Amino acid sequence: MQIKGYDIIGINIGKYSHNNNTAISLDCNEGVFATITVNLDENLDKDMAYLDTNNCSWVEDIMEKYCLGEPTGKYKQSGFCIYPLYKLDLKAIKELDNKIRK
């Protein structure tokens, strides 16, 4: 999987320490390529996350291309940015991670 000329070698699913919301980051050979989620002041279900479309303008295309989640139609503003809420397919994310780590 390539994004902006970088080979993505892993997908990490973790939690934000503040409220245990799901955090997702992508690794490349040089280290962490991007954290594609943002942690806003809202407790979410494990399979929900706001995507960082501000710093990762390509993230919704990746979610659609690899069937990793669906937009809920809900958005939340933080500062000057508005972030889309996605229902994540955690199983598909883990399967893609396993595939690209091989």
List the model feature ranges, each with a label:
Residues 53-102:
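Short, compact, well-ordered microdomains
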Residues 3, 13, 47, 72, ...:
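Generic intrinsically disordered, low-complexity segments enriched for polar/acidic and small residues
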Residues 27-68:
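Acidic, aromatic-enriched beta-alpha/helix-loop junctions
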Residues 25-32, 73-78:
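Short, flexible beta-strand-to-coil junctions
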